[in-house]
Regions:
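Glycine-rich phosphate-binding active-site loops on the catalytic face of alpha/beta enzymes
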Residues: 2-12, 75-81, 86, 130-139, ...
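Alpha-helix-loop-beta-strand connector modules within alpha/beta enzyme cores
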Residues: 16-52, 95-105, 109, 145-163, ...
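Glycine/Thr-rich beta-alpha phosphate-binding loop at enzyme active sites
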Residues: 19, 29, 117-153, 194-200
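Active-site beta->alpha loop and helix N-cap motifs at the rims of alpha/beta catalytic domains
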Residues: 2-3, 7-9, 18-85
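Glycine-rich beta-to-alpha transition loops that act as phosphate-gripper elements at the mouths
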Residues: 54-62, 86-87, 108-112, 164-172
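Hydrophobic faces of well-ordered beta-strands that scaffold small-molecule active sites
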Residues: 3-5, 51-55, 80-82, 104-108, ...
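Catalytic beta/alpha-barrel core
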Residues: 28-31, 76-89, 103-112, 137-140
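Catalytic cores of alpha/beta
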Residues: 112-122, 157, 165, 169-185
Length: 209
C-alpha cells in the first residue's frame, strides 16, 4: 500500500474535474510547494506507509529540480509521478531523483508502443504506472476487456518494476478486475470526490467511518 499526495498546479493536464477542483481550492488557499513538502514531513513523522507525490514539472522547475528532490527525500517522500515529464526527455529529473534516493515513476498508456514500454520500465523505479485509458483521471473505464488485454500485454513487457494501474478506478470491483494482471490499483479521483462531499456536507461522522 502507499499514499499519493498531489502537488497542486494551476494547469493539471492529466486530471479530471475532481482533482482540478481540489488543486484550485488548495492554490486559492495559498498552498505552496513548501507547504506540500511539510505535509509530507508531518505524515512521515507518524507513518511508515510509502508516500508518493504526483504533480507536474513546471512547479518543480521553479523550485529547482535538484533542490526539490533533495527536499522531497528529507521530507520522507519515497517517489514522484510527473505525467508531463517523459523520462527520455526529462533525464535531468530522473538523475536528480536517483541521486536523492527518490523513485521516478513513469507512465504508460494503451497507445504506448511495446518498445517504449520496455524502455520506460528500464528507466523507472518504484513501479510503472499503467494509465487505464487514454484520457483524464476519473474518466469512465467503459468496456473493460480492451483494458485487461492492454494490462496483460504490458505485464509481459514490464520486468523490472511492479505494474500499477490507475485512472477511472472507483470501486472494489474495479480493483479486483484491474488487478488480474496488474500488481495493484491506484484510486485517486473517487477518494478526492468523497473528501469534497464530506467537506461540503461537514459530515465528520461519515469521514470517520
Amino acid at each position: 500500500d502507499f499514499i499519493e499526495l498531489g502537488m497542486p498546479f494551476s494547469d493539471p493536464l492529466a486530471e479530471g474535474l475532481p482533482i482540478q477542483y481540489s488543486s484550485q481550492v488548495a492554490l486559492s488557499g495559498g498552498i505552496t510547494m513548501q507547504d506540500t513538502l511539510q505535509i509530507a514531513k508531518d505524515f512521515r513523522a507518524s507513518s511508515e506507509t510509502p508516500l508518493i507525490l504526483m504533480g507536474y514539472g513546471n512547479p518543480i522547475l521553479r523550485y529547482g529540480v535538484s533542490n526539490f528532490f533533495e527536499d522531497a527525500r528529507s521530507s520522507g517522500v519515497d517517489g514522484v509521478i510527473l505525467p508531463d515529464v517523459p523520462p527520455e526527455e526529462g533525464s535531468f529529473f530522473v538523475q536528480a531523483a536517483k541521486s536523492s534516493g527518490v523513485d521516478f515513476i513513469s507512465l504508460i498508456a494503451p497507445t504506448t508502443p511495446s518498445d517504449r514500454v520496455t524502455k520506460i520500465d528500464e528507466i523507472s523505479s518504484g513501479f510503472v504506472y499503467a494509465v487505464s485509458i487514454t484520457g483524464i483521471t476519473g474518466a469512465d473505464l467503459g468496456s473493460k476487456k480492451p483494458i485487461l488485454d492492454y494490462l496483460k500485454h504490458s505485464k509481459s513487457l514490464v520486468k523490472n518494476n511492479p505494474l500499477m494501474v490507475g485512472f477511472g478506478i472507483r470501486t472494489q470491483a474495479d480493483v479486483v478486475k484491474m488487478t488480474q494482471d496488474a500488481d495493484g490499483a491506484i484510486v485517486g479521483s473517487a477518494l478526492v470526490s468523497l473528501v469534497r462531499r464530506l467537506w461540503e456536507d461537514n459530515s465528520l461522522s461519515l469521514a470517520e467511518r
